[in-house]
């Protein structure tokens, strides 16, 4: 089960996606379905079948987004978070071999398509919560334990640790 929290930026992105699907993409596909239906026999009409399927997928996503936007709690940055890892933080960590990782801890709905975002529900994020720069973090993974050290913690929209 995923945690029902989201960053302000993530919430805005979901609202933007919903708006685009409902105002732009769905009307476009609805027109294509109507055009394909006007051609006659729908049973062998690939355009009709494809666009009808696409319309169902759009409607499914719209329902999901509407429900999700009602259910999630937006967690905004607070100055009290400075110096420790909390939700929304950009974190850089390093291990004993000198390997580094940089990422932001966000909600479940925000991680897709982003290599630099991890879910608050991930083992790494859970291990990092409330840690400070210089702290050692032991992460329990399916392959065993991994030890990392917190190199830097930053907050802010669009902030990266690059």
From Swiss-Prot:
Keyword Hydrolase included in the entry's annotation: no
Pfam family of this protein, just one? GreA_GreB
MF terms in GO: DNA binding; RNA polymerase binding
Q: Which residues form a coiled coil?
A: 52-73
Give a short account of what the protein does: Necessary for efficient RNA polymerase transcription elongation past template-encoded arresting sites. The arresting sites in DNA have the property of trapping a certain fraction of elongating RNA polymerases that pass through, resulting in locked ternary complexes. Cleavage of the nascent transcript by cleavage factors such as GreA or GreB allows the resumption of elongation from the new 3'terminus. GreB releases sequences of up to 9 nucleotides in length.
The Swiss-Prot or TrEMBL record describes its family as follows: Belongs to the GreA/GreB family. GreB subfamily.
Q: Which PANTHER family match?
A: TRANSCRIPTION ELONGATION FACTOR GREA (PTHR30437), TRANSCRIPTION ELONGATION FACTOR GREB (PTHR30437:SF6)
This one is known as Transcription elongation factor GreB
Q: Which gene encodes it?
A: greB
């Amino acid at each position: 089960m995923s945690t029902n929290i989201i960053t302000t930026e993530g919430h805005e992105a979901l609202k933007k996606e919903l708006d685009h699907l409902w105002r732009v993409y769905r009307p476009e596909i609805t027109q294509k379905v109507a055009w394909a239906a006007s051609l006659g026999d729908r049973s062998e009409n690939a355009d009709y079948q494809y666009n009808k399927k696409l319309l169902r997928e759009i409607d499914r996503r719209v329902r999901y987004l509407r429900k999700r936007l009602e259910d999630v709690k937006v967690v905004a940055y607070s100055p009290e978070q400075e110096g420790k890892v909390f939700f929304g933080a950009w974190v850089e960590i390093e291990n004993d071999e000198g390997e580094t990782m940089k990422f932001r801890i966000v909600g479940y709905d925000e991680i897709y398509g982003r290599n630099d975002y991890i879910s608050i529900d991930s083992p790494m994020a859970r291990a990092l919560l409330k840690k400070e720069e210089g702290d050692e973090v032991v992460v329990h993974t399916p392959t065993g334990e991994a030890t990392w050290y917190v190199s830097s913690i930053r907050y802010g929209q669009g902030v990266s640790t690059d």
